[in-house]
Amino acid sequence: MRKALMVLSVAGLAGVAFADGGDYGLLIQDGKVVTGVGDHDEQVIENIGERVFAADMSLVGPNWFADEPGIFIEAGSMPDNSGIGFVIESPVMRWDGTGDVDFSSMSSAPITLEFGPNSVSSSMFAGDVAGFDINYDADNPSGFDEHWDVLLDSSAGTGIYLMQLRFTVGGFEDSESTWTVFNAGLSEDIHDAAIDYVETVIVPAPGALLAMGGALVLGARRRR
């Protein structure tokens, strides 16, 4: 059951398309959080090791909005009352959808993740931003299926936005970095091209994106 208190209640939001057809699926392997593709309908996690996810955003009021991907954990697969958390690892990057895929530009606005009273926004500078925890009830026969609200100020403009984060569970090693490719108002062909780029270029060499983000931040500081 979703416990998230939806900030926005809008009928007919655009459907969400996933590169991998599901939520962030979390499990524990050898003492470490591992990601895969969560299917809450079938109550399974597939494609273990998947680290690239995707969603479409809808323009709702002053924000681009999504409530996907959610987080899915199989019933009884983690200690009861574990805190399921996350860390946003870098500023959100943006590609305007023209020319070759290029995530060298930082978004002019942060992405904010909200779940009930909890809220955290990505940084405009290099470095980690600690998120919040959501309680895991191991006794829920339907498993853990929670969805936060993803908000991006519409002033950032249409584009493809790339969010990098890792997941945390108390008592276990954090997950590897994951990347979520959000489509704000562009075609699915452009979205697919961005997803392919992240899967083939950024995931094998994540340090390249971190270096780009760091260079942008340093440049912004020098210009002040």
Label each PLM-derived region with a short phrase.
Residues G15-A19:
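Sec/Tat signal peptide C-region and signal peptidase I cleavage site
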Residues M1-A4, A220-R224:
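Positively charged n-region of N-terminal signal peptides that target proteins for export
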Residues A4-L13, A211-L216:
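Sec-dependent N-terminal signal peptides
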Residues D20-I202:
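Mature extracellular "passenger" or substrate-interacting domains of secreted, surface-exposed proteins
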Residues P204-R221:
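A short, hydrophobic C-terminal helix/tail in secreted or cell-surface proteins
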Residues S9, V198-I202, V217:
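Generic secondary-structure transition motif, activating predominantly at the C-termini of alpha-helices
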